[in-house]
């Protein structure tokens, strides 16, 4: 990356040059789907955006790694809460190749793909979606993925929006622990 910039004088008469650079992003998120045939996965269900500008962050390359949820900040009205955790920095579980409005996408390592192969579940096609009782799979403590009860209240038509449906958490254990869906759970299926 090459840039040209001209320094400016500050109040004391000294020339200064300011630069705002972001070279990485990190966070805990949820894998939404995995294709056992190709090893391709999608996660989050929404793009990763710059906290200051709200714009989608460009992604040249990246890695995913295992994470463990260490704490939950319970969500309340007007305060979304969050999952807090640690990354396993000793090995990559796969590579990232895209950050889009619909989520991040990548390919799992052969070792991690094999671990998930026996846990793969079929997903409903667009025509199979319906309102009513359902379950999401989420990890809100340690590395244990559990099923939680929800109610799908409304399905939105595909108007180009990344918003697909409105759900209501009905699972008492999840409500007690997190208060509902908190950031880092948005890719839960």
Show which residues each predicted segment covers.
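Catalytic nucleophile loop of clan PA
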Residues: 178-189
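Serine endopeptidase catalytic core focused on the charge-relay Asp
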Residues: 1-177
């Amino acid at each position: 990356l090459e840039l040209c910039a001209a320094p400016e004088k500050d109040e004391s008469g000294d020339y200064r040059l300011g630069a705002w650079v972001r070279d990485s992003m990190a966070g805990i998120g949820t894998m939404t789907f995995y294709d056992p045939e190709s090893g391709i996965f999608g996660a989050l269900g929404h793009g990763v955006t710059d906290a200051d500008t709200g714009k989608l962050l460009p992604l040249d390359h990246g890695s995913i790694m295992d994470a463990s949820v260490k704490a939950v900040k319970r969500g309340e009205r007007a305060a979304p809460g969050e999952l807090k955790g640690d990354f396993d920095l000793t090995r990559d579980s796969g590579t990232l190749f895209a950050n889009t409005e619909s989520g991040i996408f990548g390919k799992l390592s052969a070792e991690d793909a094999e671990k998930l192969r026996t846990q793969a579940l079929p997903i409903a096609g667009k025509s199979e979606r319906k309102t009513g009782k359902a379950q999401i799979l989420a990890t809100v403590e340690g590395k244990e993925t559990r099923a939680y009860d929800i109610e799908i209240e409304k399905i939105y038509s595909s108007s180009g929006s990344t918003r697909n449906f409105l759900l209501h958490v009905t699972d008492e254990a999840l409500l007690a622990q997190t208060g509902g869906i908190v950031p880092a759970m948005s890719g839960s299926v």
